[in-house]
C-alpha cells in the first residue's frame, strides 16, 4: 500500500520520520510523500528526513512559533484557519500513486490531535483515497489536560478518518514517573513505525520473486479497516537459520538455483508460535481481543518458510480468538530476509480500560475545578 504521510505536531512528525527511516532500510518503497505541520518552530527544525519545503509552521501570528501550550481549542482553530497551507505539500505530489493518506499525531497536546482531525476532514473533501489516523496516547496518564485532550482528539480523529491505529505510549514505558528522554521516544516511535511499515510494505514488490502466494494488496488492508473505529497491531519477529554461505551455496544462487530446503513442521511451529506471540504479546493498543470486528495476518520472510497451511491454520485461530469470520491473511516473500515476522492487524477494537481511565482523570480534574 502506497501512502502519503502527514505528521501533525511534534509526536506526529517524529513518527513520520521513523517511517521514512524504516522505508530507507527496506525495498521496495511504500511512502509516496511526507509532510509535517506544527505550531512550534523548533520541533519542525529538528526534523531531518521530511523535506523542508513540506514542513508548515502555522499559528505563528498567535504563538510566535512557540506552540499553544496544550490548548487544543486554539490549536484546532488555527489549523482550520490555515488548512490550505497545511495541504500545500499535496499540490505537486504524486497523489494518484497513493492508495491512502496516513495522518500521525500525538493526542494529548494542543496541536497534533486537533490538527490531525482538521487535516483528515480536508483531505477527505479533496481526495478520493481513504484517510487513516495514527493516534498516539500521551504518557501523562494522570494529567487532566492531557486526558481531556486525548479523549477529545481521539473522538474527532475517529469521526474524521476511515480508521485510527492506536498507540498507547504509557503501556510501553517501564516507569511512568520518570521523564522520558528523546532517545526513548525515538525507540518507541521506531517500534510503531516497524509495525506500520511492515503492514504498508507487504504488498509492494519489485521482482517476481517477491510476489506472495496470497498477496496482501491495498484492498486487503482497506477491507480490514472498513467501517471505521480503532485498530491495534501485534508483532513478533525471530531470526531464521542462516542461508548456505558456502562457495557452492553462493554459486547456486548466482545461477538461479535458490531453492532452500525447509522442514515443514519447523515452519509450521514457527508461524504458530509467533502468531500467538503477536496476538498475546504487547499490542500497540491493548484491548479485549474478542472486541475486534476484523483482522489481517501477514507473514514476512524467505519464501521457503512461508508455509501456506500454517498461515491458514493460524488465520483460523485468530478467527476463534476474535469471534470474527472477517480475518484475512497474506504472505510477503523477502528472499534476502534473515528473520521471520508475523504482523496481526485487528480492526474495530474497543480499548475499554484505557478510555475509562482517561475519562476518570478528565472527570476528576473537572470536579476539582468546580
Swiss-Prot record:
Keywords for this protein: Cell shape, Cytoplasm, GTP-binding, Nucleotide-binding
GO molecular function: GTP binding; GTPase activity
GO biological process: cell division; regulation of cell shape
CDD domains in the cross-refs: CetZ_tubulin-like
Name under which the protein is recorded: Tubulin-like protein CetZ6
Binding-site list for GTP: 110-112, 189
Main subcellular localisation: cytoplasm
One term under GO cellular component: cytoplasm
Location(s) in or outside the cell: Cytoplasm
Function according to Swiss-Prot or TrEMBL: Involved in cell shape control.
Family classification: Belongs to the CetZ family.
Phenotype reported upon loss of the gene: Does not affect motility. No differences in growth rate or cell size.
Amino acid at each position: 500500500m502506497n501512502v502519503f504521510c502527514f505528521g501533525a505536531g511534534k509526536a506526529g512528525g517524529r513518527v513520520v520520520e521513523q517511517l521514512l527511516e524504516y522505508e530507507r532500510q527496506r525495498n521496495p518503497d511504500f511512502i509516496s510523500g511526507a509532510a509535517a505541520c506544527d505550531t512550534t518552530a523548533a520541533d519542525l527544525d529538528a526534523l531531518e528526513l521530511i523535506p523542508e519545503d513540506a514542513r508548515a509552521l502555522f499559528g505563528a501570528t498567535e504563538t510566535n512559533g512557540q506552540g499553544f501550550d496544550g490548548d487544543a481549542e486554539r490549536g484546532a482553530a488555527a489549523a482550520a484557519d490555515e488548512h490550505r497551507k497545511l495541504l500545500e505539500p499535496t499540490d505537486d505530489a504524486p497523489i494518484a500513486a497513493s492508495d491512502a493518506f496516513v495522518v500521525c499525531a500525538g493526542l494529548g497536546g494542543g496541536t497534533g490531535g486537533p490538527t490531525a482531525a482538521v487535516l483528515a476532514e480536508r483531505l477527505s473533501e479533496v481526495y478520493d483515497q481513504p484517510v487513516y489516523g495514527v493516534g498516539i496516547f500521551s504518557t501523562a496518564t494522570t494529567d487532566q489536560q492531557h486526558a481531556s485532550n486525548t479523549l477529545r482528539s481521539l473522538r474527532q480523529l475517529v469521526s474524521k478518518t476511515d480508521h485510527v491505529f492506536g498507540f498507547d505510549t504509557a503501556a510501553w514505558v517501564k516507569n511512568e514517573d520518570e521523564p522520558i528522554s528523546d532517545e526513548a521516544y525515538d525507540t518507541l516511535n521506531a517500534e510503531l513505525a516497524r509495525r506500520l511499515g511492515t503492514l504498508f510494505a507487504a504488498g509492494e514488490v519489485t521482482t517476481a520473486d517477491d510476489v506472495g502466494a496470497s498477496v496482501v494488496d491495498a484492498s486487503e488492508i482497506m477491507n480490514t479497516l472498513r467501517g471505521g473505529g480503532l485498530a491495534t497491531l501485534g508483532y513478533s519477529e525471530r531470526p531464521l537459520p542462516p542461508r548456505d554461505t558456502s562457495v557452492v551455496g553462493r554459486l547456486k544462487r548466482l545461477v538461479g538455483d535458490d531453492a532452500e530446503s525447509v522442514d515443514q513442521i519447523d515452519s509450521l511451529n514457527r508461524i504458530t508460535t509467533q502468531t500467538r506471540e503477536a496476538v498475546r504479546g504487547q499490542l500497540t493498543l491493548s484491548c479485549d481481543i474478542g472486541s475486534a470486528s476484523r483482522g489481517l495476518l501477514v507473514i514476512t520472510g524467505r519464501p521457503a518458510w512461508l508455509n501456506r497451511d500454517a498461515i491458514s491454520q493460524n488465520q483460523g485461530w485468530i478467527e476463534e480468538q476474535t469471534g470474527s469470520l472477517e480475518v484475512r491473511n497474506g504472505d510477503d516473500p523477502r528472499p534476502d530476509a534473515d528473520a521471520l515476522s508475523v504482523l496481526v492487524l485487528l480492526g474495530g477494537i474497543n480499548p475499554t480500560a484505557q478510555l475509562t481511565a482517561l475519562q476518570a482523570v478528565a472527570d476528576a480534574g473537572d470536579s476539582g475545578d468546580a
